[in-house]
From Swiss-Prot:
Phylogenetic lineage: Bacteria, Pseudomonadati, Pseudomonadota, Gammaproteobacteria, Pseudomonadales
Sequence similarity: Belongs to the class I-like SAM-binding methyltransferase superfamily. TPMT family.
EC numbers on record: 2.1.1.67
GO cellular component annotations of the record: cytoplasm
InterPro entries (UniProt xref): SAM-dependent_MTases_sf, Thiopur_S-MeTfrase_Se/Te_detox, Thiopurine_S-MeTrfase, TPMT
Reactions that this protein is recorded to catalyse: S-adenosyl-L-methionine + a thiopurine = S-adenosyl-L-homocysteine + a thiopurine S-methylether
Name the UniProt record assigns to this protein: Thiopurine S-methyltransferase
Swiss-Prot/TrEMBL keywords: Cytoplasm, Methyltransferase, S-adenosyl-L-methionine, Transferase
Organism: Pseudomonas putida (strain GB-1)
Length: 216
């Protein structure tokens, strides 16, 4: 997945992955993590998600990482927020209150950039990546996030041979292998196939959405 792919998706407004409301799993399960107020929460590949503002509204410091400048600009504009913009290494950092959005390639982060993130929220990052990049992504999180880091992970699981991603299928086995050494608790599994015409038309008979509570 080259950066140009995602830049074009945003330029063409092909952002079906963007949700027009705060994610219900986030609202339902985040309180179970019992993170301390003002904890720093990492949101990889965040787009302009409404979830960022929700997390900040709950009293957390939010670090979102997003490749598309258009998405970052859109977030602050749509929320009526003025942002200070500065350069940090390879990233353009947009900051307003408790929200920081780092515009750049997630894989160019340095260990110290996320070393104090004791929370993790991944609704659409892992499933946006093809296999080799997923493996690298999970290695990075496992190596650099601090012990005790807690979060939520949402995945999709379907017959990948029927449909190309993104979103990509990430099965339970791959998640458990990729996050080996983490405590993984499956909180909910939802069958979405009847709500997903694209997958039905491709011949899929199942599209499972899984929600995990994770702890390093």
């Amino acid at each position: 997945m080259e950066p140009a792919f995602w830049q074009k998706r945003w330029a063409d407004n092909q952002i079906g992955f963007h949700q027009a409301q705060v994610n219900p799993y986030l609202q339902k399960y985040w309180p179970r993590l019992q993170l301390a107020p003002a904890s720093r929460v990492l949101v990889p590949l965040c787009g302009k998600s409404l979830d960022l503002a929700w997390l900040a509204g709950q009293g957390y410091r939010v670090l979102g990482v997003e490749l598309s400048r258009q998405a970052v600009e859109g977030f602050f504009r749509e929320h009526g927020l003025d942002a200070d913009v500065l350069q940090h290494g390879a990233f353009e950092v947009w900051r307003s209150g408790e929200i920081e959005l780092w515009c750049g390639d997630f894989f160019t982060l340095q260990a110290e950039d996320i070393a104090d993130c004791v929370g993790l929220y991944d609704r659409a990052a892992l499933i946006a990546l093809p296999p080799q990049m997923r493996a690298a992504y999970m290695r990075l999180l496992s190596a650099w996030l601090p012990a005790g880091c807690r979060g939520l992970l949402v995945t999709l699981d379907y017959d990948q041979s029927l449909l190309g991603g993104p979103p990509f299928s990430v099965g339970d086995k791959e998640v458990l292998q990729g996050f080996a050494g983490w405590q993984m608790d499956e909180l909910e599994v939802v069958e979405l196939i009847q709500e997903s015409p694209k997958f039905l038309q491709a011949g899929a008979c199942s599209l499972l959405e899984r929600v995990y509570r994770v702890k390093r």
